[in-house]
Swiss-Prot record:
Class I metallothioneins contain 2 metal-binding domains: four divalent ions are chelated within cluster A of the alpha domain and are coordinated via cysteinyl thiolate bridges to 11 cysteine ligands. Cluster B, the corresponding region within the beta domain, can ligate three divalent ions to 9 cysteines. PROSITE patterns: METALLOTHIONEIN_VRT (PS00203). Gene3D superfamilies: Metallothionein Isoform II. A divalent metal cation 6 binds at residues 37, 41, 44, 60. A divalent metal cation 4 binds at residues 33-34, 44, 48. A divalent metal cation 7 binds at residues 50, 57, 59-60. Residues 1-29 are annotated as: Beta. GO terms for biological process: cellular response to zinc ion; negative regulation of growth. The modification N-acetylmethionine is found at residue 1. This is Metallothionein-2.
Length: 61
């Protein structure tokens, strides 16, 4: 179960404007999502929908 989503790990879910899923894929954007995308973040660059730049990116920690 994804801690930030109501879906199983590796499963799919629907995300509205803000996607916080880490272990599942969002059907609304067809791929994994990051809430931020700082420069040099390899994980965010690999298929994430970036919502905005930030130095504090939980998906890239």
């Amino acid at each position: 179960m994804d801690p930030n989503c109501s879906c199983a790990a590796g499963g799919s879910c629907t995300c509205a404007g803000s996607c916080k899923c880490k272990e599942c894929r969002c059907t609304s954007c067809k791929k994994s999502c990051c809430s931020c995308c700082p420069v040099g973040c390899a994980k965010c660059a690999q298929g994430c929908i970036c919502k905005g730049a930030s130095d504090k990116c939980s998906c890239c920690a």
